[in-house]
Amino acid sequence: GQKEEKTFNMEKKTLKQRIKENPGLKQAVHRFIMHPVKTRPNWWIRLFDFIYLKRGKGSVIYRSVRKDLPPFNRFSLGKYSVVEDFSCLNNAVGDLTIGDYTRIGLRNTIIGPINIGNHVNLAQNVTVTGLNHNYQDAEKMIDEQGVSTLPVVIEDDVWVGANSVILPGVTLGKHCVVAAGSVVSHSVPPYSI
């Protein structure tokens, strides 16, 4: 009856689901994967990132790119997309998805949760982040208040000019252009500048 059904349902859970549901196990796995001080995975995890990072045909991530991509959130790079030198990719707090034929320019910082569409061009020194540090309690240190996330969505055929910042919760509509040096804190409709 009921006991058999419960056992059957537990067998369907993935390892990832079981880890997320067990706080002690989740903490142990996190300690194994992440360095205690640095905000990047331990070196032995980075050695095997080719196993869990999804990359499309012809995609390129230059060697100097910092890949803060632990396996507990999704990362995918579409076919024929490029991440140029000295950029930082980070999915520690949310999934990071980059579509096909997309170019992430020099020295970009991309912190999930983010969904970047197809044929998107991010010029040099662009920051796109779905992460924000909490600071509601003036009695507590900011670094003790945790973080919050709001997904960023960059739809297809968008161009973001150099030195721009795209903040959490923003959607850049299809075929829009963000001028160089912009700070984008509100969503931008499709086909606009």
Each PLM stretch: what is its role?
Residues 115-193:
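Glycine-rich hexapeptide-repeat left-handed beta-helix
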